[in-house]
Amino acid sequence: MPYGLCIGTHHTNATGDRIFYPEVRGVCVDETVNYNREIYAEMICDSRGIHVDPYMQRLIRKIKGEDRLILISDSCVFDGPIPEGYDGVTDLCFDFAGEIAGSKLSLDVACRNMMKHTGASIVDVFRYASYNPSRAIGFLDRGEIAVGKRADLVIVDHWMKVNKVIFKGELQ
């Protein structure tokens, strides 16, 4: 890939528009990530689809396929006031101006949201949250259950509630 680009971070989230002429959108980083099959697309899947709209999640999933999509949390610590209309939302961070500043997502919740928003299976979301990120950064010894691979496992129920964690083969 030219210039070493292999991961589109925060895909379609706050990446802006490149406008040369009124009402005409130019090619930006999002289109480049979508167009190039080799580039992974990272997505933040919050409960309301604020970071990435559920329709866009489905489109990106269709474009990138099962092996070039990565779920991320974008988790950060902000404690600004919750704006009107967001009461009860627990996975978004707001700055002190009331603007979205990140998420309070854990990856299990991001997986659950992806399943809800797109119809992805539990197998799909595990791939997006484990196998694909491992491949993207060159960690070939993890991200899947196989002989000779590092035993980092998360035991969940059918709706992604974490029950147990095994790290480097040890129950945590």
Model-derived segments and their meaning:
Residues 12-13, 47-48, 76-77:
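Catalytic metal-binding/acid-base residues of hydrolase active sites
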